[in-house]
Protein backbone atom coordinates (compact mmCIF):
# COMPACT_ATOMS: atom_id res chain seq x y z
CA UNK A 1 0.00 0.00 0.00
CA UNK A 2 1.25 3.53 -0.76
CA UNK A 3 2.18 5.73 2.19
CA UNK A 4 -0.07 8.55 0.97
CA UNK A 5 -3.73 8.60 -0.07
CA UNK A 6 -3.13 11.55 -2.43
CA UNK A 7 -0.18 12.72 -4.47
CA UNK A 8 0.62 15.61 -6.80
CA UNK A 9 3.09 15.06 -9.63
CA UNK A 10 4.34 18.24 -11.29
CA UNK A 11 6.13 17.59 -14.57
CA UNK A 12 8.08 20.11 -16.63
CA UNK A 13 10.56 22.96 -16.45
CA UNK A 14 11.07 25.12 -13.38
CA UNK A 15 8.68 27.92 -14.33
CA UNK A 16 8.33 31.40 -12.89
CA UNK A 17 5.27 30.24 -10.99
CA UNK A 18 6.50 26.89 -9.69
CA UNK A 19 7.61 27.93 -6.22
CA UNK A 20 4.23 29.60 -5.59
CA UNK A 21 2.36 26.65 -7.07
CA UNK A 22 4.05 24.23 -4.67
CA UNK A 23 3.42 26.57 -1.74
CA UNK A 24 -0.30 26.64 -2.58
CA UNK A 25 -0.48 22.87 -3.00
CA UNK A 26 1.20 22.34 0.36
CA UNK A 27 -1.34 24.66 1.96
CA UNK A 28 -4.36 23.16 0.21
CA UNK A 29 -3.25 19.52 0.42
CA UNK A 30 -1.03 19.20 3.52
CA UNK A 31 -1.30 15.40 3.56
CA UNK A 32 -0.37 14.91 -0.11
CA UNK A 33 2.96 13.63 -1.41
CA UNK A 34 4.27 16.30 -3.79
CA UNK A 35 6.88 15.38 -6.40
CA UNK A 36 8.55 17.51 -9.08
CA UNK A 37 9.83 15.69 -12.17
CA UNK A 38 12.05 18.00 -14.18
CA UNK A 39 15.28 18.08 -16.19
CA UNK A 40 18.86 17.92 -15.00
CA UNK A 41 19.40 21.30 -16.68
CA UNK A 42 16.98 23.03 -14.28
CA UNK A 43 17.92 24.90 -11.09
CA UNK A 44 15.91 23.25 -8.31
CA UNK A 45 17.75 24.82 -5.37
CA UNK A 46 14.68 26.81 -4.28
CA UNK A 47 12.12 24.06 -4.81
CA UNK A 48 10.72 22.60 -1.59
CA UNK A 49 9.36 19.15 -2.41
CA UNK A 50 10.65 15.75 -3.49
CA UNK A 51 12.46 16.07 -6.83
CA UNK A 52 13.59 13.74 -9.58
CA UNK A 53 15.65 15.05 -12.51
CA UNK A 54 16.02 13.35 -15.88
CA UNK A 55 18.06 13.91 -19.01
CA UNK A 56 16.32 15.94 -21.71
CA UNK A 57 15.29 13.87 -24.74
CA UNK A 58 16.85 14.56 -28.12
CA UNK A 59 14.64 16.61 -30.43
CA UNK A 60 12.84 14.65 -33.13
CA UNK A 61 12.94 15.47 -36.86
CA UNK A 62 11.32 16.75 -39.03
CA UNK A 63 8.51 17.26 -36.51
CA UNK A 64 9.13 18.08 -32.87
CA UNK A 65 6.84 18.50 -29.86
CA UNK A 66 6.70 17.75 -26.14
CA UNK A 67 5.49 14.15 -26.36
CA UNK A 68 8.77 12.49 -25.40
CA UNK A 69 9.37 15.09 -22.69
CA UNK A 70 6.08 14.06 -21.11
CA UNK A 71 6.72 10.33 -21.48
CA UNK A 72 10.13 10.55 -19.80
CA UNK A 73 9.16 13.10 -17.16
CA UNK A 74 5.88 11.53 -16.08
CA UNK A 75 7.27 8.00 -15.92
CA UNK A 76 10.19 9.20 -13.79
CA UNK A 77 7.76 10.97 -11.49
CA UNK A 78 5.46 7.97 -11.21
CA UNK A 79 8.40 5.88 -10.00
CA UNK A 80 9.10 8.48 -7.30
CA UNK A 81 5.62 9.36 -6.06
CA UNK A 82 4.10 7.21 -3.34
CA UNK A 83 0.35 7.78 -3.45
CA UNK A 84 -2.86 5.94 -4.24
CA UNK A 85 -4.57 8.75 -6.17
CA UNK A 86 -2.40 11.14 -8.19
CA UNK A 87 -2.96 14.55 -9.73
CA UNK A 88 -0.53 14.80 -12.66
CA UNK A 89 -0.13 18.42 -13.67
CA UNK A 90 2.16 20.97 -15.26
CA UNK A 91 4.75 23.18 -13.62
CA UNK A 92 3.28 26.33 -15.15
CA UNK A 93 -0.33 26.08 -14.00
CA UNK A 94 -2.20 26.34 -10.73
CA UNK A 95 -5.10 24.02 -9.99
CA UNK A 96 -6.84 26.18 -7.41
CA UNK A 97 -9.71 23.89 -6.40
CA UNK A 98 -9.03 22.82 -2.81
CA UNK A 99 -11.57 20.02 -3.21
CA UNK A 100 -10.20 18.57 -6.45
CA UNK A 101 -9.58 15.16 -4.85
CA UNK A 102 -13.09 15.14 -3.36
CA UNK A 103 -14.42 15.99 -6.81
CA UNK A 104 -12.59 12.97 -8.19
CA UNK A 105 -13.83 10.67 -5.43
CA UNK A 106 -17.43 11.81 -5.88
CA UNK A 107 -17.58 11.82 -9.68
CA UNK A 108 -14.90 9.79 -11.43
CA UNK A 109 -14.99 5.98 -11.63
CA UNK A 110 -11.70 4.45 -10.50
CA UNK A 111 -11.04 2.93 -13.92
CA UNK A 112 -11.11 6.34 -15.66
CA UNK A 113 -8.85 9.39 -15.88
CA UNK A 114 -10.36 12.74 -14.93
CA UNK A 115 -9.36 15.49 -17.38
CA UNK A 116 -10.49 19.06 -18.16
CA UNK A 117 -12.88 19.87 -20.97
CA UNK A 118 -10.58 22.50 -22.47
CA UNK A 119 -8.47 20.66 -25.04
CA UNK A 120 -10.85 17.69 -25.09
CA UNK A 121 -13.34 16.98 -27.87
CA UNK A 122 -15.36 14.17 -29.42
CA UNK A 123 -15.00 15.75 -32.85
CA UNK A 124 -11.24 15.26 -33.19
CA UNK A 125 -10.19 11.64 -32.73
CA UNK A 126 -8.26 10.94 -29.50
CA UNK A 127 -8.04 14.57 -28.45
CA UNK A 128 -8.05 14.23 -24.66
CA UNK A 129 -6.57 17.21 -22.83
CA UNK A 130 -3.08 16.73 -21.41
CA UNK A 131 -3.18 19.86 -19.25
CA UNK A 132 -3.62 17.60 -16.23
CA UNK A 133 -4.84 14.14 -15.29
CA UNK A 134 -6.31 12.83 -12.04
CA UNK A 135 -6.54 9.08 -11.53
CA UNK A 136 -5.44 6.17 -9.41
CA UNK A 137 -1.77 5.26 -9.53
CA UNK A 138 -2.73 2.00 -11.24
CA UNK A 139 -4.54 3.73 -14.11
CA UNK A 140 -1.91 6.45 -14.59
CA UNK A 141 0.82 3.82 -14.76
CA UNK A 142 -1.19 1.92 -17.36
CA UNK A 143 -1.52 5.11 -19.39
CA UNK A 144 2.14 6.18 -19.19
CA UNK A 145 4.19 2.98 -18.84
CA UNK A 146 3.28 1.55 -22.23
CA UNK A 147 4.08 4.33 -24.68
CA UNK A 148 6.49 4.10 -27.61
CA UNK A 149 8.54 7.26 -28.05
CA UNK A 150 7.39 9.66 -30.76
CA UNK A 151 9.78 9.51 -33.76
CA UNK A 152 8.90 12.86 -35.36
CA UNK A 153 8.17 11.39 -38.77
CA UNK A 154 4.67 12.85 -38.90
CA UNK A 155 2.90 15.79 -37.27
CA UNK A 156 0.63 15.00 -34.34
CA UNK A 157 -0.24 16.83 -31.16
CA UNK A 158 1.03 15.29 -27.89
CA UNK A 159 -2.44 14.84 -26.37
CA UNK A 160 -3.67 12.90 -29.42
CA UNK A 161 -0.53 10.75 -29.60
CA UNK A 162 -0.78 9.88 -25.90
CA UNK A 163 -4.51 9.15 -25.78
CA UNK A 164 -4.45 7.13 -29.00
CA UNK A 165 -1.61 5.01 -27.69
CA UNK A 166 -3.52 4.26 -24.49
CA UNK A 167 -6.87 3.50 -26.11
CA UNK A 168 -5.79 1.76 -29.32
CA UNK A 169 -2.38 0.23 -28.60
CA UNK A 170 -2.73 -0.65 -24.92
CA UNK A 171 -6.48 -1.12 -24.39
CA UNK A 172 -6.90 -2.55 -27.93
CA UNK A 173 -10.06 -0.54 -28.46
CA UNK A 174 -10.59 0.51 -32.08
CA UNK A 175 -14.20 1.63 -31.79
CA UNK A 176 -14.97 5.21 -32.92
CA UNK A 177 -13.60 7.85 -30.56
CA UNK A 178 -16.96 9.53 -30.10
CA UNK A 179 -18.36 6.21 -28.86
CA UNK A 180 -15.62 5.28 -26.41
CA UNK A 181 -14.01 8.49 -25.09
CA UNK A 182 -16.19 8.43 -21.99
CA UNK A 183 -15.21 4.82 -21.35
CA UNK A 184 -11.66 5.90 -20.52
CA UNK A 185 -11.91 9.57 -19.55
CA UNK A 186 -14.16 11.51 -17.19
CA UNK A 187 -14.36 15.10 -18.38
CA UNK A 188 -14.85 17.97 -15.91
CA UNK A 189 -14.89 21.75 -16.36
CA UNK A 190 -11.51 23.46 -16.82
CA UNK A 191 -12.64 26.69 -15.11
CA UNK A 192 -15.26 25.76 -12.52
CA UNK A 193 -14.10 22.25 -11.53
CA UNK A 194 -10.31 22.24 -11.89
CA UNK A 195 -10.08 26.03 -11.48
CA UNK A 196 -6.93 26.14 -13.60
CA UNK A 197 -4.80 29.26 -13.95
CA UNK A 198 -2.27 28.86 -16.73
CA UNK A 199 1.01 30.77 -16.93
CA UNK A 200 1.10 30.37 -20.71
CA UNK A 201 -2.05 32.46 -20.99
CA UNK A 202 -0.79 35.13 -18.58
CA UNK A 203 2.83 35.74 -19.58
CA UNK A 204 5.27 35.67 -22.46
CA UNK A 205 7.42 32.94 -20.94
CA UNK A 206 8.30 30.13 -23.34
CA UNK A 207 5.94 27.18 -23.35
CA UNK A 208 6.80 24.83 -20.49
CA UNK A 209 8.03 21.38 -21.40
How does the language model describe each region?
Residues 15-28:
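Short, well-formed alpha-helical segments that are part of the catalytic scaffolds
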Residues 37-80:
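Active-site-proximal specificity loops/subdomain of glycosyltransferases
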Amino acid sequence: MPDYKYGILLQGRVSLWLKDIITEYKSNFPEAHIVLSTWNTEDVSKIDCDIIQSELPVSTYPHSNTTNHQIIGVNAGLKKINAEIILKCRTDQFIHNKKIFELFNDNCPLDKIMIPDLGTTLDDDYRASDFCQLATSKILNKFWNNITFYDGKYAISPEIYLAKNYVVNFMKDTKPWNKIMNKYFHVMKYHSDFQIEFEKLDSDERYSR
